[in-house]
Every structure is written in C-alpha cells, then in structure tokens.
Amino acid sequence: MKKIGLLFMLCLAALFTIGFPAQQADAAEAPYKASITNISTDGGVYGKINYGQGQYWRVKYNITVSGKLLDQNGQPVPNAPVRFEADTKVGNTTQTASGTTDANGTFEVPMYLGPAAGYYTYYTSVSVHYYDIIPFRVFSGESRLVSTDNSLYHFAYQVRR
C-alpha cells in the first residue's frame, strides 16, 4: 500500500511540474494589438513562406520589424513603447529590440538575431533549406501584445543539389 501511495505522490508531483509553452497574449487583457506589415532581412531570404509548419516570415541575421500598434478599437497608438523578443536556437538566447511608435502609431525597429542552427529541413527541386522555427513576441511596456505574427522561420543555410 505504501508503494501505491508513493507512486501516486510522484505522479502528482510530476503532473504539477510539467512546463507548458508560452501562449499568445489574451486579447481581452492586452492593451494593444501589433499589426506587423513587414519584416525585412539580410541574406536574400525576404518574405513570408510556408515550409509546411505555417506561413511565417523567413529571416536571417538582421531584421527590421515594421508595423502599427492599434488599440482595442483599431485606432493607432502614438508614441508608445514597443519591444520584440525572439528565442534563437544557437546559444539558446533571447534577442530583444525596442523602439517607439511615431505620431501615426507606426514602428520600424531593427533587431539582431544572429545565426540559426538549421534543425529543420525543407527540400526543393534544386536545394535543401535548413532553418529553425523561433518564437516571436511583442510587448508594449510590460504587457505582452496580441500580434499578427508569433513565429519566424530563422534561415540557416541551403545546400544546392
């Protein structure tokens, strides 16, 4: 009987220590919404693409995030702080960049991501692409915002066939 009780306690302890991934900010709690209109990058990998895990921006080392901050009524939010975070695979680091919206609520924030590891592969007729899928978060002040984009394809390299 003691073994069953001990086993139950261990299972219960394991149940409460399991971690869950961070989720999108709750729209009811977030003061603003970040509408990302463009993410430009270096390395000739510009634009959104679908490698099979969803339609995400494909980026390399350096990016510039452009968009607009909107309040809950869809109106632009002028002169507000905006911060971006991305968790990269090389070194398991969180990269951050900050900026401020202009008088029209728009932002354009440069951000350094560094190199990607290339844990995922995508095969084309002429090459193989190696990339990571990294979480991408947006904040204003300490509040996590609802965003149009929450993940990025962090491009590592390609091998021509």
Curated annotation (Swiss-Prot):
Disulfide bonds: none annotated. The keyword Hydrolase does not apply. This is Uncharacterized protein YlqB. Keywords: Secreted, Signal. Residues 1-27 form the signal peptide. Coiled coil: none annotated. Induction: Transcriptionally regulated by SigD. Its main location: secreted. It is found in: Secreted.
